[in-house]
Regions:
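A feature for loop-to-transmembrane-helix boundaries and adjacent hydrophobic helices
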Residues: 1-274
């Protein structure tokens, strides 16, 4: 298989351009808004349509700001020190889920305060809406030729073009290993895991009344496990490589921390329910 030629820019108007990456995020937010309204009606909650719109706005802002800042500090701090304006060039790609999670957590805390709800009440409502956006974001990564996988001889392997900007950033000399060997299309694996499998798990679990914090805990555990698994197909970030044990990546380390927090939330929620 060969990577299909995908222009990252859908349409350009002079210096302004509409990109697949941005469209992926926008689609994720729209789907989250639609699911949120459906969830509010289906569970007969006290959430109004306006509150759903407001929390999606808060969450979107937190996701974009936190995702970019998190990527810069978790994965590209040296580049930031050399070129601080790089932090603002979101259109070049480079978003961190874990940074976005922290940004969304802050946003939901602020929203919870404004609506006299607890943070966990808000997060339990919101996290089932998140996975489709994660899946669309991974498709945006694929359109940008970002996050290529490790070399493989499996039938799913894909040959990435050496001329793509994201590939050249990882391999400036454009050596033959890129166009002579197939690699796992890891963004597609992660789109399936995070956008479909995670959505099915969390949505089904949250379809019945649960103790406060349980849905958030299941989300953290499920995402963490799926991310740890799919990272084994993904090439480590070139600026970091493996950070421990010659196999542990930054994404896996942060996901293991997530799993720990998720277990704590799940245990505490069960104790409260008991």
């Amino acid at each position: 298989l060969h990577y299909p030629h995908i222009d990252p820019v859908i349409v350009g108007f002079g210096p302004v351009a509409i990109r697949w990456y941005g469209l992926a995020y926008l689609t994720g937010f729209v789907v989250a808004w639609w699911l949120g309204n459906r969830r509010a009606r289906g569970l007969h909650t006290d959430w109004t349509a306006q509150q759903v719109s407001d929390v999606i706005f808060y969450g979107a802002l937190g996701a974009v700001l936190g995702g970019r800042v998190g990527y810069v500090f978790f994965y590209g701090f040296k580049q930031f020190l050399a070129d601080p304006v790089w932090l603002l060039r979101i259109w070049d790609g480079g978003m961190s889920f874990h940074g976005g999670l922290l940004g969304v957590a802050v946003a939901l805390w602020l929203f919870a305060r404004s609506t006299n709800r607890t943070f966990l009440q808000v997060s339990d409502f919101v996290v089932p809406l998140v996975p489709p956006g994660l899946g669309f974001g991974r498709l945006g990564n694929f359109a940008n030729t970002e996050l290529p996988g490790r070399m493989t001889d499996s039938p799913f392997g894909m040959i990435y073009p050496c001329h793509a900007d994201a590939i050249r950033a990882m391999n400036p000399l454009c050596t033959g290993q890129w166009e002579d060997f197939a690699r796992h299309p890891s963004p597609l694996y992660q789109a399936f895991a995070e956008g479909i499998v995670l959505f099915a798990i969390v949505w089904l679990f949250s379809s019945k009344p649960r103790a406060t914090g349980a849905v958030s805990g299941v989300f953290l555990i499920s995402y963490g496990l799926l991310r740890v698994a799919t990272e084994f197909f993904r090439e480590p970030d070139v600026q970091l490589g493996f950070i421990a044990l010659n196999w542990l990546t930054m994404g896996q380390l942060l996901s293991i921390v997530m799993i720990g927090f998720g277990i704590v939330l799940l245990v505490l929620s069960r104790r409260k329910a008991a």
